């Protein structure tokens, strides 16, 4: 695998193919770690073996655009189920083997993000949100309580310290 793959497509077949490749990479790493006594994760593997694995970060913005079956014809629903399955397995086992998910969505309720995926996402952050949305994302109301309504770019984390941070702003000129 190369250093960076950019998939900017609503083509479910492309998304499914790439996620299957990444899932297979995760399984290969798991198999390699299991082959060595006492090696249970990528950090241990990289410490004791010279062939180090790089971490893989999967970033999906607007997850609902991929997983919402109402947006696609019935013929695509099996493909969406496959994508959900791949993401669920990666969410469950990927971190130990250096495959990480960063998922973005406007409203991560059960209709958009299945419980198996949501339950295995350990770090969550939320921008200013009303009480119900904050409950869905962070399991409490801190996004409605800690972030002023007029604040732009502020987020609160699900850590015990209730960390609030400001996202870095890039304008269009800086993105070129």
Write out the residue ranges for each language-model feature.
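P-loop NTPase catalytic phosphate-binding loop
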Residues: 1-39, 53-132, 136-139, 144-148, ...
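Short, low-complexity intrinsically disordered segments
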Residues: 42-43, 167
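Short amphipathic alpha-helices and their capping/turn segments at secondary-structure boundaries
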Residues: 43-54
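Conserved AAA+ ATPase small/helical "lid" subdomain
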Residues: 146-176
């Amino acid at each position: 695998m190369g250093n960076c793959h950019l998939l900017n497509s609503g083509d479910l077949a492309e998304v499914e193919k790439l996620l299957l490749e990444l899932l297979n990479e995760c399984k290969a790493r798991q198999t390699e770690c299991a082959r060595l006594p006492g090696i249970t994760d990528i950090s241990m593997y990289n410490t004791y073996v010279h062939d180090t694995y790089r971490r893989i970060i999967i970033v999906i913005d607007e997850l609902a655009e991929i997983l919402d079956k109402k947006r696609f014809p019935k013929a695509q629903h099996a493909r969406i189920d496959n994508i959900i399955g791949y993401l669920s397995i990666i969410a469950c086992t990927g971190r130990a083997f250096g495959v990480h998910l960063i998922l973005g969505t406007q409203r991560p309720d059960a209709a958009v993000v299945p419980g198996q995926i949501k339950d295995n996402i350990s770090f969550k952050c939320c921008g200013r949100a009303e009480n119900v949305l904050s409950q869905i994302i962070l399991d409490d109301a801190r996004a409605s309580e800690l972030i002023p309504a007029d604040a732009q770019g502020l987020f609160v984390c699900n850590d015990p310290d209730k960390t609030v941070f400001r996202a870095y702003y890039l304008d269009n000129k800086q993105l070129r």
